[in-house]
Structures are given as structure tokens and as C-alpha cells.
């Protein structure tokens, strides 16, 4: 038997030519369903966005097949010449985009990028400070259920009860009392600008490293719509899929060569083996997009849209935590309406408005129920929505929440149908992926 005749026995006919629709109808149907969901519903989850077709193509490229342990020019595998090309492109574009000297583009996720920083700078049991989860922090900033809270000693700081802003006096007091090795500025549900300069002053006073996790607002930094954490931060981390509008992944940035070497060692071989080269290629594409002039307009529009949405939500009788927003997101406190975040998330989803339930500062409800929802504008802005559209969306959110307040978790079906019709009109006016 020849190799040619044996081939069908080791792979099915059409292995290199058959498209997903015929190769696996079940997975294909799920992907088509997700495409339709994204096309017909308005995405308001602050941590989600809509990538370009080019980013999707790079993510689904033949780099999926390639193993590339190590770094460009120093790989443990052969055949990495094109992997080196895309990784070097991603590195150089990230450095230019954020105005820093060193970039590691290999972290597979936001959690892994932050874990790599911990591995590079801390020893198990060392203390560090991060924004409390209940005040808008992230799991990797010291939550007791996360590795960061299990292997290290977290010292949480929070927001003030009266205005829901970070209490910098409390940050300074806690730092002086506990002498942490690391202080983290950044969060997942904080709508105001961070005082990077003050954080660095506090870090210097107690001899701590300053990490800025700008995962949520890095796209705004790239577009000049938010202050940069440089030169204040020793190290900056960011996911690449939120306001930066790239694939789901992470990066580590610094201006310090010695720290850069530590972070490289912490990512590989410390935390990861072979990087996801197809995702690195997509990061390079996204960074290239963010370097274009239109991205500055995009970033500015995200903030303008968020402010318009916050005002519209308030006009609809809802409360916005801290009174508004300086970035792309806001927390809406539903306590006065006696509506839970869980009920609002489900009701809004029935109305084709996708958001997530979220705890609000000093929330008395559990994280599985919550008293609030988190709203964001990056995905809608990518569609092409401007202030007018987001003012309409804010009013629609108010209508759905009022229906829940009247009727309980089942909501008002007639209102939700009317809102669905309005959402369908908006999505038809601003379509996405028309050729998919």
C-alpha cells in the first residue's frame, strides 16, 4: 500500500479542504448563532468589544499550528522565522502605541499577565495592595478565591461611602502601616481617572513597586482619551480585547530593562510554555489599527458616549455610582428601584441589550444577585453609535428596569418587545460583519 492510498486512513477525505459547515455542523451552528447574537443585540458589557475582520482572520490563521517556545531569535523550536516576524511586529507596535521601552506580548490572558508580574516581583506570603473587589477591583488584585489572595497577603483599599471615589488618604495610610512590596492601581468597575502620580508617590514612600493594570482603559490611553500610567508606573499590564479592540490576551509593559528581563523570565518559562502565535499575530494587527489616526477619534467617542449614556440613565431615574464616568464604563445602582442586578441582566437580555450584573460599593446582596449592573460603550462605539444613539439606549434601559420594578423578575413583556424592536432598528442601521 502506497502513502497516497494510505492517506485516507490517517485523515478523512477533505481534511485540508472541507469547511466547518460540513466538517462539524454542530459547532458551525453554534458559531452562526453567536454571530447572529452579536449582530442583532447591543453589547453593553464593558469588558467586551467587536474586533475587525482582520483581527478575526489573524486569530484563525495557520499560526494555530505553530509551537514557538522562547522569544524572537531565541526559540527552542525550528521553523519560527515567521513567528518571529509577527511577535516582533507586536512588540514594536505596543512600544510605540504606549510610549514605553519594553513589551512582552506573550501572556495568554489578563490573569496570566498579572500572575507573571507577581512571580517576577514577589515571594509567596509577601504583602501587596489592590482595589477591593467590592469597590470595583479585579479577582487577580487580591480576591481570597484567587491565587493572588491565596499565595500572597492582600491589603485591600476601597472607595469612600459618600462619593464612591478612591480614598487616597486611606491608600497612603494602609501603605505606611503595612509596607507592601507591590501596589496595584486599576480595576474592573471603577469609572473615574486614577491618580497615577499620587500612587507612585505613595509607592516610593514605602519602597513598593507600582503596577498599573489598565486592562479596561488601555484603548483610551492608546487613543489619548485617558492619562497614561507612564512614566509613573514601574510596570503596566493590560488585556487586549476590551477598549483596545484586539484578541483576547494580555501584555506587560515597562521602561525598566532589568524588570523587563524579570517579566520575560516570569512569562516563559515561569508561567507559560509555547505562546499562542496566532493570537500574537492578531495582537500585532490590533496594535497597528490603534496606531492609526481614526483610533484617536474612536477613543474620544467612547468617552463621549459613556457620558451621554450615564446622563440618559440618570434621566431615566436610575442612580450612577460616583455620579458619572470619566472612561468607558459606569455602574448603575438599582437599589432605589428594588430591582436586583440579576433580574436586570436577564430582563435587558430579553430586550436584546446585553450587560452584566455587578456589585456596587457596600452592596448588601451576594455577587450572584447584586444591586447593580455595569454598562460600557466600547462595542457600541465600534458599531458606529454616537451620543444620540446612547441617549436612546439609556432611555430604553430605564423602560426595562421600570417594568421589572412594577412586575418583578418577569418584567413587562410588552415593554421588552417594544425595546427589542428599537434595538433591531439600531442594529440594522449600524451592521457588523456583513460578509460573514
Curated annotation (Swiss-Prot):
Alphabetical UniProt keywords: Amino-acid biosynthesis, Cytoplasm, One-carbon metabolism, Pyridoxal phosphate, Transferase
Location within or outside the cell: Cytoplasm
GO function terms (MF aspect): glycine hydroxymethyltransferase activity; pyridoxal phosphate binding
SUPFAM superfamilies named among the record's database cross-references: PLP-dependent transferases
Gene Ontology CC annotations of this record: cytosol
Residues where N6-(pyridoxal phosphate)lysine is found: 242
GO biological process, one term: tetrahydrofolate interconversion
Catalytic activity: (6R)-5,10-methylene-5,6,7,8-tetrahydrofolate + glycine + H2O = (6S)-5,6,7,8-tetrahydrofolate + L-serine
Site location (Plays an important role in substrate specificity): 241
Pathway in which the depicted protein is active: One-carbon metabolism; tetrahydrofolate interconversion; Amino-acid biosynthesis; glycine biosynthesis; glycine from L-serine: step 1/1
Cofactors: pyridoxal 5'-phosphate
UniProt-annotated binding residues for (6S)-5,6,7,8-tetrahydrofolate: 133, 137-139, 366-368
Broad enzyme group: transferase
EC number in record: 2.1.2.1
Oligomer status and interactors: Homodimer.
PANTHER family attached to this UniProt entry: SERINE HYDROXYMETHYLTRANSFERASE, SERINE HYDROXYMETHYLTRANSFERASE 1
Classification via NCBIfam families: PRK00011.1 (NF000586)
Record function comment: Catalyzes the reversible interconversion of serine and glycine with tetrahydrofolate (THF) serving as the one-carbon carrier. This reaction serves as the major source of one-carbon groups required for the biosynthesis of purines, thymidylate, methionine, and other important biomolecules. Also exhibits THF-independent aldolase activity toward beta-hydroxyamino acids, producing glycine and aldehydes, via a retro-aldol mechanism.
Family according to the record: Belongs to the SHMT family.
Protein name stated in the entry: Serine hydroxymethyltransferase
Source organism of this protein record: Novosphingobium aromaticivorans (strain ATCC 700278 / DSM 12444 / CCUG 56034 / CIP 105152 / NBRC 16084 / F199)
Lineage: Bacteria, Pseudomonadati, Pseudomonadota, Alphaproteobacteria, Sphingomonadales
Amino acid at each position: 500500500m502506497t502513502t497516497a492510498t494510505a492517506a485516507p486512513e490517517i485523515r478523512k477525505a477533505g481534511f485540508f479542504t472541507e469547511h466547518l459547515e460540513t466538517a462539524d455542523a454542530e459547532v458551525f451552528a453554534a458559531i452562526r448563532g453567536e454571530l447572529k447574537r452579536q449582530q442583532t443585540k447591543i453589547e453593553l458589557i464593558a469588558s467586551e468589544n467587536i474586533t475587525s475582520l482582520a483581527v478575526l482572520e489573524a486569530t484563525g490563521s495557520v499560526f494555530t499550528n505553530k509551537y514557538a517556545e522562547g522569544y524572537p531569535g531565541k526559540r527552542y523550536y525550528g521553523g519560527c522565522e515567521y513567528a518571529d516576524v509577527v511577535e516582533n511586529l507586536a512588540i514594536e507596535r505596543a512600544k510605540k502605541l504606549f510610549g514605553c521601552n519594553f513589551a512582552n506580548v506573550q501572556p495568554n490572558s489578563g490573569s496570566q499577565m498579572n500572575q507573571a508580574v507577581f512571580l517576577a516581583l514577589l515571594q509567596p506570603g509577601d504583602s501587596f495592595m489592590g482595589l477591593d473587589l467590592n469597590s470595583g477591583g479585579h479577582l487577580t488584585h487580591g480576591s481570597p478565591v484567587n491565587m493572588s489572595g491565596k499565595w500572597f497577603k492582600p491589603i485591600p483599599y476601597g472607595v469612600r461611602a459618600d462619593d464612591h471615589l478612591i480614598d487616597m488618604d486611606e491608600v497612603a495610610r494602609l501603605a505606611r502601616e503595612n509596607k507592601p512590596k507591590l501596589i496595584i492601581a486599576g480595576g474592573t468597575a471603577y469609572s473615574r481617572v486614577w491618580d497615577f502620580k499620587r500612587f507612585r508617590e505613595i509607592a516610593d514612600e514605602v519602597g513598593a513597586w507600582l503596577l498599573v493594570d489598565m486592562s479596561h482603559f488601555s484603548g483610551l490611553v492608546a487613543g489619548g482619551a485617558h492619562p497614561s500610567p507612564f512614566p509613573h508606573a514601574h510596570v503596566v499590564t493590560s488585556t487586549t480585547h476590551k477598549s483596545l479592540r484586539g484578541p483576547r490576551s494580555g501584555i506587560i509593559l515597562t521602561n525598566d530593562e532589568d524588570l523587563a528581563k524579570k517579566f520575560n523570565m516570569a512569562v516563559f518559562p515561569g508561567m507559560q510554555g509555547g505562546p499562542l502565535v496566532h493570537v500574537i499575530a492578531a495582537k500585532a494587527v490590533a496594535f497597528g489599527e490603534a496606531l492609526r489616526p481614526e483610533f484617536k477619534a474612536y477613543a474620544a467617542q467612547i468617552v463621549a458616549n459613556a457620558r451621554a449614556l450615564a446622563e440618559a440613565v440618570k434621566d431615566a431615574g436610575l442612580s450612577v455610582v460616583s455620579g458619572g464616568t470619566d472612561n468607558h464604563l459606569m455602574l448603575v445602582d438599582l437599589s432605589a428601584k428594588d430591582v436586583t442586578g440579576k433580574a436586570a441582566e436577564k430582563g435587558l437580555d430579553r430586550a436584546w441589550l446585553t450587560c452584566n450584573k455587578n456589585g456596587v460599593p457596600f452592596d448588601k446582596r451576594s455577587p450572584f444577585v447584586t444591586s447593580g449592573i455595569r454598562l460600557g460603550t466600547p462595542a457600541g462605539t465600534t458599531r458606529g453609535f454616537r451620543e444620540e444613539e446612547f441617549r436612546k439606549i439609556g432611555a430604553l434601559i430605564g423602560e426595562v428596569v421600570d417594568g421589572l420594578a412594577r412586575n418583578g423578575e418577569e418584567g413587562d413583556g410588552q415593554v421588552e418587545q417594544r425595546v427589542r424592536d428599537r434595538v433591531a432598528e439600531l442594529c440594522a442601521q449600524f451592521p457588523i460583519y456583513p460578509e460573514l
